[in-house]
Amino acid sequence: MPRQFSLENTRNIGIMAHIDAGKTTTTERILFYTGRVHKIGETHEGSATMDWMEQEQERGITITSAATTAQWKGTRINIIDTPGHVDFTVEVERSLRVLDGAVAVFCAKGGVEPQSETVWRQADKYKVPRMAYVNKMDIMGADFFNCIKMMKERLQANPVPIQLPIGKEDNFQGIIDLIEMKAYYYMDDLGKVIEQRDIPEDMRELAEEYRTNLLENVAEYDEELMMKYLEGEEITEAEIKAALRKGTIAVKAIPVLCGSSYKNKGVQRLLDAIVDYMPSPVDIEAIKGVSVDGETEIERHASDDEPFSALAFKIMSDPYVGKLCFFRVYSGKLSSGSYVLNATKGKRERIGRLLMMHANHREEVDMVYAGDIAAAVGLKETTTGDTLCDEANPVILESMNFPEPVIHVAIEPKTKAGQEKMALALQKLAEEDPTFRTYTDQETGQTIIAGMGELHLEIIVDRLLREFKVEANVGNPQVAYKETIRKSVKSEGKYIRQSGGKGQYGHCWIEIEPKERGTGYEFVNKIVGGVIPKEYIPAVDAGIQSAMNNGVLAGYPVVDVKVTLYDGSYHEVDSSEMAFKVAASMAFKEGMKKADPVILEPIMKVVVTVPEDYMGDVIGDLNSRRGRIEGMEARAGAQVIHAYVPLAEMFGYATALRSRSQGRGVFSMEISHFEEVPKNIQEQIISGRAKNNSSDE
């Protein structure tokens, strides 16, 4: 199948916004006008095409970024819908990574809300060209000009309005196009009948002022235009558009449009602007990668003639075709049925079917080209962030970094029969989502799930029930403590049972010493002259390790100790591996009690970004959580606080930060190291553990 749209006529864009700015509704309207959906879906009716997971339709928020292909005026537009909730930042990160440009949707009333700041900073990180669409111009309190002001102040952006609204709230009737200097009025409900008129008299002056602002702005991106402007010559529409496109792609200007997606006003203009100002794959820098040995940097240009390279950015389980792998083609072309190399894993993969995705149906294609976003069926080894490439020309593209999970809870199926089903389901979900982990707790034997926040884990539990029919009980979030010692001791362990028949005899002397934090366990055998025969030495080591699984203070695993076996005795008949294992275990337990044992807790490295006004409050709160502030730095209208805080004190922090910063603060945390717990808290942990154990019995 030959290429339908040239690379120049391809746009890969994301639609990003705060929850409730009307992002999904805007995407729905785009699909309606580009002819892909016959009946418009409404989010609040729960029928929106892009929100295809059941929980999304119930909660009215977008969780998984669905990729959709649409066409407008001879251009193919691939749209990635991204979620706006802070627990799903990984979805936003991974979609920004494969886009060429983004449309930021703002609510005309709320303006730049906290999540918009977060997403904006993520887009800054990847240098993604953006345009802005001020939505909901028809609602009470809508204020286009305040929204522009907030973009300057909160995002340190350079917004360039190319439209002005005519009227607002109930009286929102249409827009003034500042490039054509004409007014457009919407005459019907579906926004298909539009009347062009002259700019109304009462808005003439304002339009002239914003037109001047627009010309001054675009003149900066084109020297010829600058000369024309300074000499007062006429500047054509085509010249303005070309210069603004240049500024947008260089991430220096943000074209701003307005409308009301729900009332079908302004969406076709938005589509025109996507074609006019958003980059094609050819406009952005060639993607960089490295050779498989990591030695040489390799570039791949957006061209069908270069060797094939693509990045897998999302894995999904599909009820009809199994595992779907979404990928962005950066160079070359790929046909279904062919073999590719997964360079990240060093594995060969066969591409089964190739699908172009509409939000809820799919179209099978036999070939995809540079710049396309598609999904493949049949990939066994590939996970999020992997590079797929031509076997003869391997390359590893820059992958995505995913944060470590910050919260974990125990989970168990409601029925014994559900155990295996649950394990399989959790494994599938972990394949789809790199920030979700599942493992078994060695001490309690419980299954633990870990993720980016409470909503994240709630949705996982919800999906277990809906998609995999597994009912599960979930515990409270827990901290994984450890135990260690502070001084060296010598200790004896004797296990002797000799009362008729085969006896038991094991006897050893060990020295236990503290080691540096994070260096683990070390066993040294210093037995000379065979006082303990060689074959029993591994049993002594095993006995010590089994005793280390449960420390003497509160039963947490023991870490960072060195144990030296230096003396003992044995009995020719009664000694056995079992006897030495028990003796060593007894020696360790007795010795640890005398070695000044302490509990260690995980310390998190916490980074909080808040607007300056809330800084004092946030720092005070971190201090009250036993936090150590390590430093601060100013960043685009906000302060970034670096601190170390015990994990035990961080539960419920997302909610606390939200209320202390009126929802404008964001934070990330990852494990840094383990540290001794203060004495008073150690006592609380020990008594809490004792209570739990007695209630379990």
Swiss-Prot record:
**Could you tell me where this protein is found in the cell?**
Cytoplasm
Q: Which GO terms describe its biological process?
A: ribosome disassembly
Which positions does UniProt annotate for GTP binding?
17-24, 81-85, 135-138
The entry lists its GO molecular-function terms as: GTP binding; GTPase activity; translation elongation factor activity
Any one Pfam family match given in the protein's UniProt record, by short name: EFG_C
Xref: InterPro entries: EFG_II, EFG_III, EFG_III/V, EFG_IV, EFG_V, EFG_V-like, EFTu-like_2, G_TR_CS
Supply one GO CC term from the record: cytoplasm
Cited CDD domains: EF-G, EFG_III, EFG_mtEFG1_IV, EFG_mtEFG_C, EFG_mtEFG_II
Swiss-Prot/TrEMBL keywords: Cytoplasm, Elongation factor, GTP-binding, Nucleotide-binding, Protein biosynthesis
UniProt xrefs under SUPFAM superfamilies: EF-G C-terminal domain-like (SSF54980), P-loop containing nucleoside triphosphate hydrolases (SSF52540), Ribosomal protein S5 domain 2-like (SSF54211), Translation proteins (SSF50447)
In terms of superkingdom, the source organism counts as Bacteria
Predominant location category: cytoplasm
Presence of keyword Cytoplasm: yes
Q: Which family does it belong to?
A: Belongs to the TRAFAC class translation factor GTPase superfamily. Classic translation factor GTPase family. EF-G/EF-2 subfamily.
Q: Which HAMAP family match?
A: EF_G_EF_2_B
Q: Which PANTHER family match?
A: RIBOSOME-RELEASING FACTOR 2, MITOCHONDRIAL, TRANSLATION ELONGATION FACTOR G-RELATED
What is the protein named?
Elongation factor G
Q: Which organism is it from?
A: Acetivibrio thermocellus (strain ATCC 27405 / DSM 1237 / JCM 9322 / NBRC 103400 / NCIMB 10682 / NRRL B-4536 / VPI 7372)
